[in-house]
UniProtKB/Swiss-Prot annotation:
This is Cytidylyl-2-hydroxypropylphosphonate hydrolase. GO terms for biological process: antibiotic biosynthetic process. It is an enzyme of class 3 (hydrolase). It catalyses: cytidine 5'-({hydroxy[(S)-2-hydroxypropyl]phosphonoyl}phosphate) + H2O = (S)-2-hydroxypropylphosphonate + CMP + H(+). InterPro entries: DUF402, FomD-like_sf, Ntdp-like. It comes from Streptomyces fradiae (Streptomyces roseoflavus). Its cofactor is Mn(2+); Co(2+). The gene is fomD. Changing Y107F: 250-fold decrease in kcat with (S)-HPP-CMP as substrate. Does not affect the KM for (S)-HPP-CMP.
Length: 207
């Protein structure tokens, strides 16, 4: 059984509306509904629609308010596909141009391996990101300084910080060698008709 299935729930069906959340201090820091594209031992893929409602946990949190809270309670960018290989400490976001819808870049979000819950998936962002433009294998590291500051002030233990750095470095090497685990054809994936409708919450939409 994969780590993403560790709590014993069954795989979610294609099109199911589930909760995707970051959990901090034992409670949701941010959560939002997504639609399931794939849920297998090798791949979990979910779609976040433009305009989806974002729900933020009530302060105080040890890391402060979630940074997305500055931008309101809706996902304002184009819809995105999030790809996760169970057990790995990152997900890959397929980012598109907001105006044209054209594939723009792979955005590797370093985070805790997704943990399956009865309502969806739980993780926690680890700050470091890798950005790979559509026309290049050349990647750009992002927010390393933020991660190192969190490590310095104790938001990550020394062991956790070492593991996070290693995960980011492993993904960077895989990309540079053209050996990334995800299928690049996902850059051409389009959501089915009706999936761009606004999602308010996983409870109401998934019932």
């Amino acid at each position: 059984m994969t780590e993403a299935a560790s709590e014993g729930t069954e795989s979610f069906a294609f099109g199911a509306v589930v909760e995707r959340r970051d959990e901090l201090d034992g409670r949701p820091w941010i959560s939002y509904p997504v639609r399931v594209v794939a849920d297998t031992p090798e791949l979990v893929a979910v779609h976040l629609s433009h305009g989806t409602r974002l729900t933020f946990g009530d302060d105080p949190f040890s890391w402060g308010p979630h940074p997305w809270q500055l931008f309101g309670d809706r996902w304002q960018s184009a819809g995105i596909l999030q790809l996760h290989r169970p057990g790995r400490g990152h997900s890959v976001w397929v980012l598109r141009d907001a105006d044209t819808g054209a594939f723009r870049e792979w955005y590797v979000n370093v985070e805790a391996p997704w943990r399956r819950t009865p309502t969806g998936f739980s993780t926690l962002d680890h700050e470091i990101d890798l950005v790979v433009p559509a026309d290049s294998r050349t990647l750009r590291w992002k927010d390393v300084e933020k991660f190192e500051e969190r490590a310095r002030i104790g938001h990550f233990s020394p062991e956790e910080a070492t593991a996070i750095r290693a995960e980011a470095a492993d993904v960077a090497r895989e990309i540079a060698a053209g050996e990334q685990w995800w299928d690049t054809r996902w850059s051409r994936w389009e959501p089915p008709a009706g999936w761009n409708a606004l999602l308010q919450s996983f409870e109401t939409e998934g019932s």
